Regions:
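Non-heme di-metal
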Residues: 2-237
């Protein structure tokens, strides 16, 4: 699909295009496959967990900045849907702040303090994915929909829920239910957040130009996320 189509796609056509792109490009890597199979060492797991700290922690401030761009004078349903996602991430709906849950995972699951995680220098792919996601969320509401809403949170039909896969893999490796609360609550949250993003995007992809803007943010973020996943392979050596 070109950067800008000859005619505007319907919202369903646009989402189907995004799903196909995400299915093709975001396939994981050798490290994540080894983690799921239980073939990683404790040291390798600790490196991965510390890397992910640098992806998880900036995400919620980026989501807050994204919501601040929402144009509510003409259409406010999209802002309401994304605000619900933000409320969940910040711990105002059911579970605690997701950043705090990740710190609990580090502490209880790996014996890693936040100070130690901060000292860890993340891989280039992790830096790239974090930077791309945060940049688009701070650029415009439409680009945030492409990056955070569709590239990160939209589910690919027929593909296992990513949080569920990691939850089960880490549970088999011996992590406690308490430590794994971060991934357990994301099993349900990812589905809801992805559906909210799909519903929110429709008013912002009515023209070819709008679709090109969202497509650009979506594709770049998917490629950056793929680079992060494949970058973890360095921890296998």
């Amino acid at each position: 699909m070109p950067f800008m189509t000859e005619r505007p796609l319907t919202p369903r056509e646009f989402l189907d295009e995004c799903i196909a792109f995400k299915r093709e490009r975001l396939t994981g890597g050798r490290f994540l496959a080894a983690l799921v199979q239980g073939n990683v060492t404790a040291a390798q797991l600790r490196l991965w967990a510390k890397d992910m700290y640098h992806f998880v922690q900036p995400g919620i401030p980026a989501l807050t900045a994204w919501l601040a761009h929402a144009p509510t004078a003409v259409e406010r349903e999209s802002a309401r849907l994304i605000a619900r996602n933000l409320a969940g991430e910040l711990g105002y709906l059911r579970e605690p702040d997701h950043r705090d849950l990740y710190l609990k995972l580090l502490d209880e699951g790996f014996g890693i303090s936040e100070a130690e995680a901060k000292e860890h220098l993340p891989l280039a792919g992790t830096i790239g994915a974090t930077t791309a996601l945060c940049a688009f969320c701070r650029s415009s509401f439409a680009e945030g929909l492409g990056a955070f809403g569709l590239a990160l949170e939209m589910q690919v039909p027929g593909r296992p829920n990513g949080a569920a896969v990691l939850y089960e893999a880490l549970r088999r490796l011996g992590l406690s239910e308490s430590a794994l609360e971060f991934y357990r609550i994301h099993v349900e949250a990812e589905e809801e957040h992805g559906e909210n993003a799909e519903r929110a995007v429709a008013p912002f992809i009515q023209t070819r130009e709008q679709q090109a803007l969202v497509r650009h943010a979506f594709r770049w973020t998917v490629i950056a996320l793929a680079g992060m996943q494949q970058g973890f392979d360095a921890y296998l050596s």
